[in-house]
Regions:
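Hydrophobic alpha-helical elements at and bordering transmembrane segments
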Residues: 5, 9, 112-113, 157
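Secretory targeting signals
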Residues: 27-89, 114-185
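Helix-loop-helix units of permease transmembrane domains in multi-pass membrane transporters
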Residues: 88-121
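Hydrophobic alpha-helical transmembrane segments
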Residues: 1-81, 85, 93, 179-180, ...
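Residue-level recognition of transmembrane alpha-helices
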Residues: 22, 116-117, 160, 164, ...
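Membrane-helix interface segments
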Residues: 17, 108-114, 182-188
Length: 240
């Protein structure tokens, strides 16, 4: 599987991954700033935070809500990037017969299959984790300057990173479609649907109860794993 991941990295290139990451951060920041400017004018920031944060100063509330929305849009963008990577790596490999070339390596069909998925997770996940860690680190530092104790600490960051990992795994649902339907439209539409479902679940559970997001992630993860098993069975029977 390492060979497939190395070949996938060479096929995409570090420059393309870096450009995806920078575009994702810039887009998420712009959208978040626009949304929060309206919420701040209407003084509705506290409604998007737990009740314990209602007594915090307005600038700290702004920072917390900005962080929550920024990470939310970063996750959504990562789901879309996973869809593009799936199309670029898997569908392009089918069309250009790269799978036939890769199959000449001492690899089983199963190793080839999971090697492609591992490459997608790594290429989409590493930039997200790095960006997420930097954003959370800056937020924690900023909050320690303005408030003590900080509402978000190491435990909060660990939970956010765990949630990110589940988002990445669920994002494979759009990648699985690339093994069934070799068209960009199917892959991207499925990624957009995942974005809508998970973003709505995230915003809703911020207001009500955080357990709802875990329930949605668990259901989607189960569906993803079933699809992975089905597409693996389908892939092993294909003529490369």
């Amino acid at each position: 599987m390492r060979q497939i991941m190395k070949l996938s990295w060479r096929q995409l290139g570090a420059q393309k991954i870096l450009s995806y990451s920078l575009f994702l951060v810039a887009t998420a920041t712009c959208i978040t700033a626009i949304i929060l400017s309206g919420l701040a004018k209407d003084k509705r920031l506290a409604s998007l935070l737990p009740a314990t944060a209602a007594t915090l100063p307005a600038n700290i509330q702004y920072g917390l809500v900005f962080y929550n929305f920024e990470i939310l849009f970063l996750r959504a963008g990562t789901l879309l990037i996973e869809g593009f990577l799936a199309y670029y790596l898997i569908v392009d490999a089918w069309k250009n017969h790269n799978l036939m070339h890769w199959a000449t390596y001492p690899l089983t069909r199963t190793q080839l299959y999971f090697g492609l998925f591992s490459a997608i997770l790594l290429l989409a996940g590493v930039p997200l984790v790095i960006i997420h860690s930097l954003a959370a680190g800056m937020l924690v530092s900023w909050l320690f300057i303005w408030a003590s104790p900080a509402p978000l600490g190491i435990a909060g960051l660990s939970l956010q990173l765990l949630t990110d990992g589940l988002f990445l795994l669920v994002g494979l649902l759009s990648s699985v479609l690339a093994f069934w339907k070799y068209q960009l439209s199917y892959v991207i539409v499925s990624a957009l649907l995942l974005c809508v479902i998970l973003c709505n679940a995230s915003v809703y559970t911020q207001r009500v109860h955080p357990g709802g997001l875990w329930s949605v992630l668990s259901i989607l993860l189960l569906v993803t794993l079933l699809e992975v098993a089905g597409s693996l069975k389908h892939f092993t029977k294909q003529d490369l």
